[in-house]
Amino acid sequence: MDDATFLASYDPAAFPPLAVAVDVVPLTFHTGALHVLLTKRAEHPARGRLALPGTFVHAQEELGAAAQRALRDKAGLNTPVRQFQAFGAVDRDPRMRIVSIGYMAVVDAGTMMAATASAVASELLAVTGDSVRNAAGRRTALPFDHGDILARALSDLRRDLDRDDWAFGLLPNTFSLRELQALHEAIRGQTLNKPAFRKRLIESGRLE
C-alpha cells in the first residue's frame, strides 16, 4: 500500500475529537510595572470573566497567524508574537479536549494604551510575581489554565532577558538606561545594583 492509497481510506473520525487553540499573553511596561492585557469573554464557559485573548485555529491557518488574529480581533493589536509552550492538560477546558499553543507579545505602553482605549472589552492589569491584580490591588484569578500560561510566559521572559532583545519591545523606540534598568527590575521582581547592571550590559555587547 502506498501513501495515496492509505490516505484515501484514512478515517479521521476513528480518533477522539481534538481542537487546537492559541492563547496570547500581551505584555507591556507601564508606570514602572509589568502589565498584561486581558479581554472579557463574550461566550460560555467563563462568560464575562477576564482572560487571555485566544481563539481556535482554523483548519488551513498557521499557528502564528491565529495568534495574531486573536490579538487583532480581541485586543486591537497588530504586533509580532513569539511561541513559548503548548498546554495540553486533559481537563484544561470543560468543552472538549483542547490543546492550546501559548504565544507572547511585547508592546510599548503607548501602543498598548491606545489599544485598551479602543477595545471596550479589555483591561490592563498589573503583574505581580506570576499573578495579576486589578486597580484595587486585589489578585484576579484567570479562567481555564490561563494563570499557568501567564506564569510560563513570564518565566520565559525572565530566562531570555539577557539572551536577546525581545523584551526591548516593551519600551518606546528611545529610552534611557534608567528606564531599561526599571524594566529589568520589573521583569525580575527585584532591585538591581546600578553599576553592576550597566557593567553586565557592556560586557554583553548590548551597550557601548
Label for each model-derived stretch:
Residues 15, 88-98:
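Acidic pyrophosphate-coordinating catalytic loop
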Residues 186-192:
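Short, basic interhelical loop/turn and adjoining N-cap
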Residues 24, 83, 103-105:
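A structural signal for short, well-ordered beta-strand segments
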Residues 5, 9-51:
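N-terminal strand-loop-strand
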Residues 33-78, 86-88, 159-185:
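Conserved Nudix-box catalytic region and its N-terminal flanking loop in Nudix hydrolases
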Residues 19, 78, 96-100:
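Short connector loops at helix/strand junctions that flank enzyme active sites
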